[in-house]
């Protein structure tokens, strides 16, 4: 397609060699080489996408403990797919979940992150308000840490990266 649009073969080769992928789609922030903590981010916001992301990270880092911070997006999606989200998230070794990101929706009585988290079967799981996530991360050790969700969890990535690399948030 690029050649038909007028690009030269050299342009295509250069473009492919420097393409880093789509932002927030299995984006590697820290690669975890040499046994260091890996940090990844994915926009996954449906149960199938969450499951696929967790399975992919387990294949990329076999034998390593996968911790996931999943920020639910929308009350209606949480209500409609709570069981499916719990099943998908249960494939991670550890699940951390902040409150639902409401976007355009008003709260629905009885619908919160615990609707999903209560059915997660991972050996380690916890609810953590978004405002407290950086402190939780600072006081924890992670092998592989992945943020998931369509909301604004990715805005914490620069500070999470600094914490993992031995610094602190700005």
Locate the predicted segments by residue.
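ATP-dependent carboxylate-amine ligase
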Residues: 1-170
């Amino acid at each position: 397609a690029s050649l038909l649009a007028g690009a030269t073969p050299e342009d295509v080769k250069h473009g492919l060699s420097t393409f880093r992928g789509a932002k927030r789609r299995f984006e590697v922030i820290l690669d975890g080489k040499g046994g260091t903590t890996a940090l990844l981010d994915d926009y996954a916001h449906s149960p199938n996408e969450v499951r696929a992301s967790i399975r992919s990270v387990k294949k990329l880092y076999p034998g390593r403990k996968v911790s996931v911070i999943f920020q639910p997006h929308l009350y209606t999606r949480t209500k409609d797919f709570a069981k499916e989200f719990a099943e998908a998230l249960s494939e991670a070794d550890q699940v951390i979940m902040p409150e639902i990101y409401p976007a355009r929706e008003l709260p629905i009585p009885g619908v919160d992150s615990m609707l999903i988290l209560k059915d997660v079967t991972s050996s380690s799981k916890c609810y953590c308000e978004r405002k407290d996530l950086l402190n939780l991360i600072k006081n924890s050790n992670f092998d592989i840490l992945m943020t998931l969700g369509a909301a604004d969890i990715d805005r914490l990535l620069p500070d999470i990266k600094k914490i993992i690399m031995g610094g602190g948030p700005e």
